[in-house]
Curated annotation (Swiss-Prot):
The lineage of its organism: Bacteria, Bacillati, Bacillota, Bacilli, Lactobacillales. Mixed channel protein that transports both water and glycerol. This is Glycerol facilitator-aquaporin gla. Gene3D superfamilies: Glycerol uptake facilitator protein (1.20.1080.10). It comes from Lactococcus lactis subsp. lactis (strain IL1403) (Streptococcus lactis). The chain crosses the membrane at residues 10-30, 41-61, 87-107, 151-171, 209-229, 264-284. A motif (NPA 1) lies at residues 68-70.
């Protein structure tokens, strides 16, 4: 299968939308008044985000499944992804996050109207550090704690992601192996050679399937372990896109309790994961590649 870059952009859009539907859908189920899981276990959110990463990775890993601008930038900065496609990937990821969030709002709108806590409403869209109590005096502490939390969690995520996967997936494995063998002077038109390529690619894809499952559980573990201070972030598109949706939607949609989108904090879940990704991918490449 010859996968075009246009297909990859669309896949990043779809994959990021799925992440938001599963992840922020779980948050909405727990945070919004009147839902079946209102005020229930944080594990629901952990499972939601874990599956939100796992499902796109398993479904689209043979095409593309970065679904995170920070990861895309980290790979590009380390020479593992072409810079020519970074902007398109990030745009697709942010738009996918916004689309997924709009679907969540559509499904949960009656419960937004019932909810009286503005932080609970915002929490179903984007993150905010719990040090913040709507007092400007707490903003510095919230910013510092939030940045540290996002950086540590994102570093673990991206280091684990690079360790568990590599740039070649599915059909790309076949293309890479074919070009490599051509460069070595092999006759790739030979049926025996092509059979060997397909066997190797199939084995690599099977290994990556396990890696994708691992990534889902890694995200779930990080949400459970480090989600307490800020909520599940680790992804600039996951925070910025839904936060923008929150700021644009009127109270007639989200209810009279809709509060501030807290743009003063918005740079934290964008910049911290990006810096963590650059550091994690560079460190992994320096040690292992």
């Amino acid at each position: 299968m010859d996968v075009t870059w246009t297909v990859k952009y669309i896949t990043e859009f779809v994959g990021t939308a799925l992440l938001i539907i599963m992840g922020n859908g779980a948050v909405a189920n727990v945070e919004l008044k009147g839902t079946k899981a209102h005020a229930q276990s944080w594990m629901i959110i952990g499972w939601g985000y874990g599956l939100g990463v796992m499902l796109p990775a398993v479904a689209f890993g043979n095409i593309t499944s970065q679904i995170n601008p920070a990861f895309t930038l980290g790979l590009a900065a380390s020479g593992l992804f072409p810079w020519a496609h970074v902007a398109q990937y990030i745009i697709a990821q942010v738009l996918g996050a916004m689309f997924g969030q709009l679907l969540i709002v559509m499904v949960y709108r009656p419960y937004y109207l019932k909810t009286q806590n503005p932080n609970a409403i915002l929490g179903t869209f984007s993150t905010i550090d719990n040090v913040d109590d709507n007092d400007k005096k707490t903003r510095l502490g919230a910013t510092i704690n939030g940045f540290l939390n996002e950086f540590v969690g994102s570093f673990v995520l991206f280091f684990g992601a690079v360790a568990a996967t590599n740039i070649f997936f599915g059909s790309q494995s076949i293309t890479w192996m074919t070009n490599y063998l051509k460069g070595q002077g092999a006759d790739v038109s030979s049926s025996d050679i092509m059979n060997q390529i397909w066997v190797q690619a199939s084995g690599a894809s099977a290994s990556k399937m396990v890696a994708h499952l691992f990534l889902g559980f890694l995200v779930m573990g990080l949400v459970v372990a480090l989600g307490g201070p800020t909520g599940p972030g680790l992804n600039p598109a996951r925070d910025f896109g839904p936060r923008l949706v929150h700021s644009l939607l009127p109270k007639s949609v989200l209810g009279e309790a809709k509060g501030s989108s807290k743009w003063w904090y918005a740079w934290v879940p964008v910049l911290a994961p990006i810096l963590a990704s650059l550091a994690a991918v560079a460190l992994f490449k320096m040690i292992y590649l």
